[in-house]
A protein has these predicted regions:
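Functional surface patches built around histidine and acidic residues
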Residues: 1-264
Length: 264
């Protein structure tokens, strides 16, 4: 399958995850974006083959994974129309973070996985500044976010106040077990930034969950049109980012990225 088809279906799935959906009679989401993974895309499950065994053979370390197989659609949009209701529970699973899409003729396969945490992730500040470096790399060249083309944008600078706002929200989501731009106290990113002393003319936020490495989380945001647009917004000049772990430090990882343009 050509890469463009895989990218389009992943983009459509991430748009689906960005909004609250009705799934099996219940309101679900929004949930974080999925990161395209070439290893998962390269796995072909034959009859009687076990997904976990194939993942191990491909050297993909997963905390959990599932495969979806379906036939008939001739393009990505048709595929999305087929799966958004049939497989809504899997597509909206908040614990999965990586995705691989493959196709042979009109037979499609999607693998969704939760990767293990990167042993070299570092503390939240190290990881946050690594996110900044990866974001600036993305901003240094044109990007396509959904149907919108963005030109290269100036590099962002690290801001400790935005980083503190990001850490606060990541820790709150991880500790209280929710995923939303709105905190349990009702505050959103604008209030959190102000409470940490950041006076802004423009503010924005990306959140994600499940990605165990910096490269994975940034690739997930870039593969999701709304998150990608935040990354490429040329009017932002500063950024902070942080992750937090749920439970006793062994739970799901949650990421927050805050963008700002200070008042002058």
């Amino acid at each position: 399958m050509v890469a463009d088809e895989a990218d389009e279906l992943i983009s459509l799935i991430n748009q689906f995850r960005e909004s609250q959906q009705t799934c099996e009679g219940q309101r679900v989401g929004p949930v974080g974006p999925l990161t395209p993974d070439q290893t998962l895309s390269g796995i072909r499950l034959g009859q009687g083959e076990q997904l976990q065994s194939m993942l191990q053979q491909a050297d993909y370390q997963a905390a959990g994974a599932q495969a979806l197989a379906f036939s008939g659609p001739t393009d990505a949009e048709m595929a999305m129309r087929m799966i958004d209701e049939r497989y809504c529970s899997a597509l909206l699973d908040p614990d999965v973070a990586d995705i691989g899409v493959s196709r042979e003729g009109n037979n499609w396969q999607i693998i969704l996985a939760q990767p293990l945490l990167d042993d070299d992730l570092g503390d939240w500040q190290e990881a946050g500044k690594a996110v900044l470096a990866r974001v600036n790399e993305a901003r240094s060249s044109p990007q396509t976010c959904g149907n919108t083309e963005y030109q290269a944008a100036p590099a962002l600078q690290w801001d400790a106040k935005l980083a503190a706002a990001a850490l606060e929200h990541s820790e709150d989501m991880a500790e209280q077990g929710y995923f939303s731009h709105t905190g349990r106290d009702g505050r959103q990113v604008d209030s959190r930034a102000r409470d940490h002393g950041y006076q802004y003319s423009r503010i924005g936020e990306n959140i994600a969950a499940g990605q165990g490495a910096v490269e994975q989380v940034v690739q997930g945001w870039l593969a999701s049109p709304g998150h990608c647009s935040n990354i490429m917004e040329s009017s932002y000049t500063e950024m902070g980012a942080a992750y937090a772990l749920g439970g006793d430090g062994e739970g799901t990882i949650v990421w927050t990225q805050v963008f700002g343009t200070p008042l002058r």
